[in-house]
From Swiss-Prot:
NCBIfam families: PRK04208.1. Belongs to the RuBisCO large chain family. Type I subfamily. It catalyses: 2 (2R)-3-phosphoglycerate + 2 H(+) = D-ribulose 1,5-bisphosphate + CO2 + H2O; D-ribulose 1,5-bisphosphate + O2 = 2-phosphoglycolate + (2R)-3-phosphoglycerate + 2 H(+). This is Ribulose bisphosphate carboxylase large chain. InterPro entries: RuBisCO, RuBisCo_large_chain_AS, RuBisCO_lsu_C, RuBisCO_lsu_C_sf, RuBisCO_lsu_fd_N, RuBisCO_lsu_N_sf, RuBisCO_lsuI. The active site is at K175, H294.
């Protein structure tokens, strides 16, 4: 060690514990265009000031540790440290605050969601000084966004591949999710695609189990795709789940799907992990495969209002890591999803530029520059009576996916698909004619029933089905008043 280094490291050094806010709370800081910005919902332990809690989050997710260390003198903390630059109380909550933290871009490896999350949502979430901590939103700067490939293809390329425009895409998850043989599974795929669906889907927990090995499933599903395409004249697809126990096995399954000539594969991106997902997304772009993403495990992370991570952050991370579709809730079905919050992260998935809008839970303006968009998938407890609302809420650039709402039709799988396709076409036509789907939706469906006995039967079966439970993760009561 040189004398100069020894002198620099020893000047002003004193071992011991000091308050985080002395170094990491900087309300005078002006954020840079290259900073990654984070909004944390912080619940300090009793007796911990919010400034100290916010500073602790900034410190423990960047350069800080619990004590002063002499090696601080060997680097430029002012250049590399995270900074808590603003704190505001959460309306209606006595002990919760939103802490805004800015991170210098040099803290993160280029093109790595894994590294970004290891810092920002790492050990700090177990910090004893905090009763709870939730990451509400991230601002990803263009300088960092440009280091990612993002979705393999994006919305427009997918529409061109499928030759389908001017309406939402229509899908179905094959049920029962577990237990079918590969041949019976392929039969269900064929019947649904022949009936008018664009896609069918492996359920997220269908991988390669004793009752149905992955290779057999891929072969029977490919046969179903080609047979239904020949009979309908439409391009069809089935989300073949390539998720596996190792990255090598996952890629092997994707390679086999490509060799079969199918258009799309699938991945469970949270249980599979971001490193695996990014690897698969790169393979899909290089080999012309679309990539459908399921979000299994998300509610473990995002459902509680005061701890974890909001799904809008997971959605942004997926757009960076890569996926052409991702499940995004339904608002009207059986799964959790506040309407305004859902619309907020749907825009973050699809649009190139999204303005800050606290009424929809968007804390920062997000510029995606040239990163392709992702189609949101509405799936979970939906049926034909929901079609007007889904068409109105999600618009054309979406996938509406009915599992039980197709396979539960009293006449069988193909009639279930017919019912959904007729309902969708009726809603799109009515919307294009200027009718209000939110007001006239039920009437539009009833009119279509006159021309489709399959739809009439579906409407009769599901006329009483409701999922009327309150949303747990709601927006804060006065969020709409925040600029």
């Amino acid at each position: 060690m040189s004398p100069q280094t020894e002198t620099k490291a020893s000047v002003g050094f004193k071992a011991g514990v000091k308050e985080y806010k002395l170094t990491y709370y900087t309300p005078e800081y002006e954020t840079k265009d290259t900073d990654i910005l984070a909004a944390f919902r912080v619940t300090p332990q009793p007796g911990v000031p919010p400034e100290e809690a916010g500073a602790a989050v900034a410190a423990e997710s960047s350069t800080g540790t619990w004590t002063t260390v002499w090696t601080d003198g060997l680097t430029s903390l002012d250049r590399y440290k995270g900074r808590c630059y603003h704190i505001e109380p959460v309306p209606g909550e006595e002990s919760q605050f939103i802490a805004y933290v800015a991170y210098p871009l040099d803290l993160f490896e280029e093109g790595s969601v894994t590294n970004m999350f290891t810092s920002i949502v790492g050990n700090v979430f177990g910090f004893k000084a905090l009763a709870a901590l939730r990451l509400e939103d991230l601002r990803i700067p263009p300088a960092y966004t440009k280091t990612f490939q993002g979705p393999p293809h994006g919305i427009q390329v997918e529409r061109d591949k499928l030759n389908k425009y001017g309406r939402p895409l229509l899908g179905c998850t094959i049920k029962p999710k577990l237990g079918l043989s590969a041949k019976n599974y392929g039969r269900a795929v064929y019947e649904c695609l022949r009936g008018g669906l664009d896609f069918t889907k492996d359920d997220e927990n269908v991988n390669s189990q004793p009752f149905m090995r992955w290779r057999d499933r891929f072969l029977f599903c490919a046969e179903a795709i080609y047979k239904s395409q020949a009979e309908t004249g439409e391009i069809k697809g089935h989300y073949l789940n390539a998720t596996a126990g190792t990255c090598e096995e996952m890629i092997k399954r994707a390679v086999f799907a490509r060799e079969l000539g199918v258009p799309i594969v699938m991945h469970d991106y949270l249980t599979g992990g971001f490193t695996a997902n990014t690897s698969l997304a790169h393979y899909c772009r290089d080999n012309g495969l679309l990539l459908h993403i399921h979000r299994a495990m998300h509610a473990v992370i995002d459902r509680q209002k005061n701890h974890g991570m909001h799904f809008r952050v997971l959605a942004k991370a997926l757009r960076l890591s890569g996926g052409d579709h991702i499940h995004a809730g339904t608002v009207v079905g059986k799964l959790e999803g506040d309407r305004e919050s859902t619309l907020g992260f749907v825009d973050l998935l699809r649009d190139d530029y999204v303005e800050k809008d606290r009424s929809r839970g968007i804390f920062f303006t997000q510029d995606w520059v040239s990163l392709p968009g992702v189609l949101p998938v509405a799936s979970g407890g939906i049926h034909v009576w929901h079609m007007p609302a889904l068409t109105e809420i999600f618009g054309d650039d979406s996938v509406l996916q009915f599992g039980g709402g197709t396979l539960g039709h009293p006449w069988g799988n193909a009639p279930g698909a017919v019912a959904n396709r007729v309902a969708l076409e009726a809603c799109v036509q009515a919307r294009n004619e200027g009718r209000d789907l939110a007001v006239e939706g039920n009437e539009i469906i009833r009119e279509a029933c006159k021309w489709s006995p399959e739809l009439a039967a579906a409407c009769e079966v599901w006329k009483e089905i409701r999922f009327n439970f309150p949303t747990i993760d709601k927006l804060d009561p006065s969020a709409e008043k925040v600029a």
